[in-house]
Amino acid sequence: ATEGFTAPADGVIARSAEATVILDLDGDRDERTGWVLFFFHVATEGRIAEGVEVKKGDLLGFPSCEGGRSTGTHIHVARRYNGEWIPAAGPLAFVLDGWVAEYSGIAYEGTLTKGSKVVPACRGCARAENQIIYTLPE
């Protein structure tokens, strides 16, 4: 992939191995405490090293098909708080740059919504309307 993905917040890389990057937001380097962001299907080449302190917008790596079965190059992002996975949708919805995750009740069948734009999840597709690429403001 030519488009890398960047840190959505300041933190420190608690783990970087085997298609995974863990961004620790409280900076204690312990992914079992506080908020952490989990990125999966991260390419080995260009992946940020463990222990690096990052600022919002710093390059973390590149989407890939590494780390298991995949129908195409992509990235997963999830979050944990004190070691517990926090659902993307619901009362504590995951919001990234105004995009709000919504769950349909079926795995991989949710949407991202920002204002009037709704982007449905789509298994195995590469339609332009299902791609969100964020550019940091200058």
Tell what function each PLM region has:
Residues 1-2, 6-50, 69-79:
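Zn2+-dependent peptidoglycan hydrolase active-site motif and core
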Residues 31, 61, 118-121:
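Secretory pathway export signals and precursors
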Residues 39, 54, 60:
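Short alpha-helical segments in extracytoplasmic peptidoglycan/chitin-binding modules
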Residues 49-55, 73, 78-138:
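Acidic, glycine-rich catalytic/binding loops that coordinate metals and/or anionic ligands
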